Amino acid sequence: MDGHHVDLAIIGGGLGGVAAALAACEKGLSVILTEETEWIGGQVTSQGVPPDEHPWIEEFGATGRYKLYRRKVRDAYRRIMKVVDDDKALNPGNGLVSAICHDPRVTLHVLQELLLPFQLTGHLTVLVNATPVKVEKQGRRVEKVWISSGGRLTGIEAPYYIDATETGDLLPLAEISYVTGAESKEDTGEPHALEEADPLDIQAFTYVLGMEYREGGYHVIPEPDMYTFWRDFQPGIWPDKLLSFFAPHPITKEKRAYSLFDGGMGFPFGPTGASWIHLCSG
């Protein structure tokens, strides 16, 4: 069993964990950053999800470090991929959901580049494929976090720990009180909170499907199990069949048509979609 003694231990290597590591290393602290997957970067890398940003991100509403990250993503395309585009608001993937859609490997490259100087000076240690499995406490104080990686246990001791995991993995391990879902008005005093708390009111998990259209081909497979059920299934809150080109508007909940190909009249290529694309692209 190995061991690490550092000023700050960050468990979870998503964007938040990386940002915390950079801030601490810039202050001269010794830091260890652990990540349970093969890559740091969290949703932007391992899950392939573009940054979910507000419409004014190009003008205001971002930290200096996040602005630097965004610039480096765009610069990577110009420098490495030889993209000839002087637009400061370059959207490499030309996606709808973000003004900076890009290949997950680019974020991985950018984050590793930002962290490398501190790794070379010995201020930072990064452990991937490292999962927290046990927490040792003395009273209310966390004394050590045990990480499992490749069948080996590593103990990490630090005066300060940051839980930057996707789902708060250290909370149950450390037996720290926590809640899930949506709190009630009585819990928080928020006027728009639920009347009663709902522990299951959380953001849904998303499974991404990669699809390719090949004109003229026929690629229909035999009907899988429960095909008929899912073909015809319509949830109570849905305006049409779940697997169709109709879905509720995210704000008004009105029925909205979608289009698969450019030139269609449904979202995102129809009139309202075109306006949204223009808004997101600045």
Predicted regions and their residues:
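Beta1/beta-strand and adjacent pyrophosphate-binding region of the FAD-binding site
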Residues: D2-G14
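Residue-level recognition of alpha-helix boundary/capping or hinge positions
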Residues: D2-H4, S30, K137-R140, W146
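Loop/turn elements at helix/coil->beta-strand transitions in domains of secreted/extracellular proteins
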Residues: H5-D7, K27-S30, T121-L124, T154, ...
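N-terminal Rossmann-fold NAD(P) dinucleotide-binding loop
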Residues: G17
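Aromatic pocket-lining residues of Rossmann-like dinucleotide-binding sites
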Residues: A24
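Conserved N-terminal/central alpha/beta ligand/cofactor-binding core
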Residues: L29-S30, E35-A130, K134, Q203-T206
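Flavin (FAD/FMN)-binding glycine-rich loop and adjacent Rossmann-like elements that form
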Residues: T45, V128-N129, G139-R141, S149-Y160, ...
